[in-house]
UniProtKB/Swiss-Prot annotation:
This is Proteasome subunit alpha type-7. The keyword Cell inner membrane does not apply. One of its GO terms (molecular function) is identical protein binding. The 26S proteasome consists of a 20S proteasome core and two 19S regulatory subunits. The 20S proteasome core is a barrel-shaped complex made of 28 subunits that are arranged in four stacked rings. The two outer rings are each formed by seven alpha subunits, and the two inner rings are formed by seven beta subunits. The proteolytic activity is exerted by three beta-subunits PSMB5, PSMB6 and PSMB7. PSMA7 interacts directly with the PSMG1-PSMG2 heterodimer which promotes 20S proteasome assembly. Interacts with HIF1A. Interacts with RAB7A. Interacts with PRKN. Interacts with ABL1 and ABL2. GO terms for cellular component: cytoplasm; cytosol; extracellular exosome; nucleoplasm; nucleus; proteasome complex; proteasome core complex; proteasome core complex, alpha-subunit complex. Changing residue 153 to F: Displays impaired G1/S transition and S/G2 progression. Belongs to the peptidase T1A family. The modification Phosphotyrosine is found at residue 153. Component of the 20S core proteasome complex involved in the proteolytic degradation of most intracellular proteins. This complex plays numerous essential roles within the cell by associating with different regulatory particles. Associated with two 19S regulatory particles, forms the 26S proteasome and thus participates in the ATP-dependent degradation of ubiquitinated proteins.
Length: 248
């Protein structure tokens, strides 16, 4: 039997191949990084080069779901559009029904449940995306969650998805400390440093968004990102000089 063709049939060794293939699609997507700070959440995405005549504003990997929640994704953009639209409708429906915005976990659970349903029904295929979902709850607590094509979700302090996820995650495991997220600027720099592990041409290929407590999503413009990149490069040079002095 061809187990890799049927979505709802397990292989003898317990695999759902269509779900695993969807996870492979995620690994080919642009790298996305999320970091939860003290009073800020930051999303960063590797920005692929666009055609000369293409309007780059139409190629967005970070989007708001509600005033207090946003997400970045890696994988198939067309699949992400469906998930984003469904999540936005759910956020609005929740506001109308309960008269309160959604919690970050609520909308993450909704997205994860939507993905899971597409792994268990005929005539559909799994969504080929992973998502990093960030935001603030009513009490001002910052949150970061990650979902994958199988419908599982987890809370994180910092995480990465996409083609460079492994090396970026290793960087974050080494460098994520209480000191590294002490201020908003330090948290933003941590995300940029993590992305620079896989992005070759500096700040021009990075898309960055920040959300602060009681403030809506802000997409940083290229000049702001370049300013942070220049500061990071300067810090690197100073550290190298200090090392050379110690060695001599």
């Amino acid at each position: 039997m061809s187990y890799d063709r049927a979505i709802t049939v397990f292989s003898p060794d317990g695999h759902l191949f269509q779900v695993e293939y969807a996870q492979e699609a995620v690994k080919k997507g642009s790298t996305a990084v999320g970091v939860r700070g003290r009073d800020i959440v930051v999303l960063g995405v590797e920005k692929k080069s666009v055609a000369k005549l293409q309007d780059e504003r139409t190629v967005r990997k970070i989007c708001a779901l509600d005033d207090n929640v946003c997400m970045a994704f890696a994988g198939l953009t067309a699949d992400a559009r469906i998930v984003i639209n469904r999540a936005r409708v759910e956020c609005q429906s929740h506001r109308l029904t309960v008269e309160d915005p959604v919690t970050v976990e609520y909308i993450t659970r909704y997205i994860a449940s939507l993905k899971q349903r597409y792994t268990q029904s005929n005539g559909r295929r799994p969504f080929g995306i992973s998502a990093l979902i960030v935001g603030f709850d009513f009490d001002g607590t910052p949150r970061l969650y990650q979902t994958d094509p199988s419908g599982t979700y987890h809370a994180w302090k910092a995480n990465a998805i996409g083609r460079g996820a492994k090396s970026v995650r290793e960087f974050l495991e080494k460098n994520y400390t209480d000191e590294a997220i002490e201020t908003d600027d330090l948290t933003i720099k941590l995300v940029i440093k993590a992305l620079l592990e896989v992005v070759q041409s500096g700040g021009k290929n990075i898309e960055l968004a920040v959300m602060r407590r009681d403030q809506s999503l802000k997409i940083l413009n290229p000049e702001e990102i370049e300013k942070y990149v220049a500061e990071i490069e300067k810090e690197k040079e100073e550290n190298e000089k200090k090392k050379q002095k110690k060695a001599s």
